[in-house]
Structures are given as C-alpha cells and as structure tokens.
Amino acid sequence: MSEPARLISPEKRGEDLDMTLRPQSLDEFTGQAEARANLKVFIEAAKNRGEALDHVLFVGPPGLGKTTLAQIMAKELGVNFRSTSGPVIAKAGDLAALLTNLEERDVLFIDEIHRLNPAVEEILYPAMEDFQLDLIIGEGPAARSVKIDLSKFTLVAATTRLGLLTTPLRDRFGIPVRLSFYTVEELELIVRRGARLMNLPMTEEGAREIARRARGTPRIAGRLLRRVRDFAEVARAEAVTREIADEALTRLLVDNVGFDQLDKRYLNMIAVNFGGGPVGIETIAAGLSEPRDAIEDIIEPYMIQQGFIQRTPRGRVLTAIAWKHLGMQPPKEMEAAQFRLFQEDD
C-alpha cells in the first residue's frame, strides 16, 4: 500500500509527535470553537464537583486534534494521562492492567476504539458504567468470576468510523464530540504559530499558501510547514514567502487544493474509465490497488467535504468541481444522468 509514504496522509508519523508545536491548553487550541467551548464547561463543572469527567468520544477524520484535545483535557483537569489504541489491547488482561493502574479521575485515551477486540469491549462496559472489572479466572469447571473495583476515571476515545462502534459502547459515552475539517483561516493561524515556534520568518501569504494545501487538517499543515522550511533553509531565503511555499509544495507534488498523485489517480480513474461515475468503492479500490478502508478514511472525506465527489446508492460520482479541477469536460449526458441519480437518492 502506498498511502503511508504520502506527504499529505493525515495518519500519524514520528515527526508529528513533536510536542513543541502542539497547543498546551484549550485557549491555545485553534479551531473547533464549539467543541472547545463545550469542553471548557464540562471540565470546569467536573472540577467544581470534584468528580471524574464523563466519558468522551471524539469522532472525525484523522489529524484533526483528537489526541491533542485528550491531552489538554487531562492537563486542565490536573490529572494523569494514559494513552493506548484499540488494536494494541489484544486481550482482557491488557485492558485490566491499564484500568487497575489508573488513579482517581485519571484520563485514559483509546485511539481507534472502533478496532477494539469484541471480547475486550465486553469487559469495558462495566468498567465505564460501574467502575468495576468483571473477569473470569481459570477455565472449565474451575473458572470463577472476580470483580475488581476501579478508581473513577474518564475514558476519552477517538474514532474515524462511528458506524463501526456497537450501540452499547457508543451509548456509554456521555459527551460525544464531532470534529470537522479546519478552515483555511484557522490553518493559517496554526501555520503561523508553528513558524514562530520554529523561529522561521514567514509572510502572511506564505502561511496562507501552506494552509490552502493542507486539506483542512492541522497534522498535514505541520508536516507541510516542516518540508517548506527545508526548502527555504537550503535556498537561504530570508523568509518563507508565497512563492517559496508554492515552489516547494509544487516540487513535492501537492497541488493548489492539497491533492497529490494518488488523489489525482482516483479522480482520473472515475473520469476516464467510468465516465464520471457512478462507480462502486470496491471497483475503485481494485483499480487503485488500495484497501477500501484507506480510500474511505483517507482519500474521500476531504473530497466529499470540498464537493469533488458525491456518494450515491449506485457509487461515487464526480461533480462539476472535480471535472473543472481535472481540466476536463464532463460527458454531455452527465448532467441529466446525475439529475436522475440524485432524484433516486432522494
């Protein structure tokens, strides 16, 4: 799979874990204004009552700040922060070890909770609801149930695929928070803040050029900023201008809306091979030699949000925006066909 090597992948990489660029408080955090305002209220109320914050579920595409917000919440609550991910918790004993080491009101963050083992998920229910572990010790006739009391903790979980969560698990989160893609203006503020922390002189136009190509995602904005800095330093530029940012990102094959070669292959395949669609996701995955999950989680969310493609009952369809971006004319019958298709959708 080619996706991990992509510069504009929103998935985590080692360089993205640099804490110096991350905001340390809700006031420093840029974007997600409604979510931040609500979290401030919930955190303040929990602190005033001396109680553990209710369990929180963050939902949204990768790279929007779910992990950062969880860390900030623990910091503002004045408690310890523990972090893991769904695939790492392979068996009930792994979860038990995590939960029994938590202190009162601590925050446990589970990323990719939709990938949690179903057997482990069953153990999590009483832990979240009653702060108890109900474990089966031994096997066969000698097996017995053991209840272990836990400190009252806050589970903060993150998922990119809300539909993959079971209803019993989803219903146990008292505070659901949906995160959305960032505006160019918000990303520009994030880029300028990152440049200041790097001691990197940058013009407003330079910051905006990076923000425009960051796919609405702070993690990608930070990565593009680091790569543009490399080009600027080697060129011995006094500051990152729009021209320097444009040249660097163009050389890195990131176009003016943040699409790379894989995105263009996706759009071109639908346009050229299937006349603009509709075409099913499995056909697209086979044509690109990419897993379906990667297409649905990584490639498509930003395209859909920006109006480049439509999902219909019969498959993906290119919009007029996509045809214009490709520099192609849609088939003459496309407009009438799409009109009928979306009527069926209604």
From Swiss-Prot:
Region (Head domain (RuvB-H)): 256-346
BP terms from Gene Ontology: DNA recombination; DNA repair
Top EC class of this enzyme: hydrolase
Keywords for this protein: ATP-binding, Cytoplasm, DNA damage, DNA recombination, DNA repair, DNA-binding, Hydrolase, Nucleotide-binding
Top-rank taxon, per record: Bacteria
Sites where the protein binds DNA: R292, R311, R316
One Gene Ontology cellular component: cytoplasm
Residue segments, region Small ATPAse domain (RuvB-S): 183-253
Binding site for Mg(2+): T67
Region (Large ATPase domain (RuvB-L)): 1-182
Keyword DNA damage recorded: yes
Subcellular location(s) per record: Cytoplasm
Reaction equations catalysed: ATP + H2O = ADP + phosphate + H(+)
SUPFAM superfamilies xref list: P-loop containing nucleoside triphosphate hydrolases, Winged helix' DNA-binding domain
Major site of localization recorded for this protein: cytoplasm
SMART domains in UniProt: AAA
UniProt key word Acyltransferase: no
Domain notes: Has 3 domains, the large (RuvB-L) and small ATPase (RuvB-S) domains and the C-terminal head (RuvB-H) domain. The head domain binds DNA, while the ATPase domains jointly bind ATP, ADP or are empty depending on the state of the subunit in the translocation cycle. During a single DNA translocation step the structure of each domain remains the same, but their relative positions change.
Subunit structure: Homohexamer. Forms an RuvA(8)-RuvB(12)-Holliday junction (HJ) complex. HJ DNA is sandwiched between 2 RuvA tetramers; dsDNA enters through RuvA and exits via RuvB. An RuvB hexamer assembles on each DNA strand where it exits the tetramer. Each RuvB hexamer is contacted by two RuvA subunits (via domain III) on 2 adjacent RuvB subunits; this complex drives branch migration. In the full resolvosome a probable DNA-RuvA(4)-RuvB(12)-RuvC(2) complex forms which resolves the HJ.
Family from the record: Belongs to the RuvB family.
Protein name from the UniProt record: Holliday junction branch migration complex subunit RuvB
Originating organism: Rhizobium etli (strain CIAT 652)
